[in-house]
Amino acid sequence: MNSIALGFLVINKPAGLTSHDCVNRLRRIYGIKRIGHGGTLDPAVTGVLPIAIGKATRLLSFLPSPKTYEGTIKLGISTNTDDLTGETISEHSWDQVKENSILNCLNKFQGEIKQCPPIFSSVHINGERAYKKARRGEFFELPPKLIKIYRIKLINWNKKDGTIDLEVHCSPGTYIRSLARDIGKKLGCGGALAKLNRTMALGFNIDQAIELPDLDKNNDLNKPMIIDPLKALSHLPSIKLMTIDELSSWRKGKHLILSKSRLKNPLYLIEDDKDIPKTFLTVINNENHLIGLARWHHEPFKIEPKIVFNADG
């Protein structure tokens, strides 16, 4: 049995593989079935793919949800997939586009906006993925979804090639392909996503990312170091259970009334992230091992077990 209990990896996903391909390879390398990823990337997209190992799959929803991308938009072309892998629908000149008009356009997309997902996407329609209906040539429209663009920044404008390089910091559920399409429409010439790299997801950034291990070198030296889940959850407050009675009650899923003064990092905020409830904390034992997550309540201060791991560490 593999000795890994729980933790995270950050993979720098290469182009050409699905997120599930990466998970399958890691399952074979580690000999563990319980491995999941935190946020699907299209095969052509590269960059940060957070991987949860073992019981850490239960922690994914407690990680910070905003994501950051660096992408390139090709102006003058519209496709059925909203990127350059699709069939061309129309082509137009971008000669009239100037840098100031791009900056003004990008400003209109900052904040909360409604966005229609691409028809070639994994959105469900009556129990079926949208891309399956699109492949059959069916005509349909997807309803707009409310998303949030926290930051959108112009990195470079190449007038000759008609390409816009930009950085986007956004809420989950944002389609950068749709953003490329809509920016092209507002600029009056159409646009499609040419390239995309995710540089941050679930609190992990590209500097932490490693290359996907090679299956042909399946040995202990080839297994990347697992990131301690407490590091991934450092945005949450923490409390330590110190007595046998406290640990016993925790194992049994009982509420514990404790002193609030035992809280570590009690004043915390997750900026612009409404997806993580502000009432959760990590629970550790005397060896500083994560033994679960709890919901905390005021007056009296008590913790209610939400996720319980082995209290022995």
From Swiss-Prot:
One of its GO terms (biological process) is mRNA pseudouridine synthesis. Pfam families: TruB_C_2, TruB_N. The active site is at D42. Keywords: Isomerase, tRNA processing. InterPro entries: PsdUridine_synth_cat_dom_sf, PsdUridine_synth_N, tRNA_psdUridine_synth_TruB, TruB_C. It catalyses: uridine(55) in tRNA = pseudouridine(55) in tRNA. One of its GO terms (molecular function) is RNA binding. Its EC number is 5.4.99.25. Disulfide bonds: none annotated. Responsible for synthesis of pseudouridine from uracil-55 in the psi GC loop of transfer RNAs. Belongs to the pseudouridine synthase TruB family. Type 1 subfamily. This is tRNA pseudouridine synthase B. It comes from Prochlorococcus marinus (strain SARG / CCMP1375 / SS120). The gene is truB.
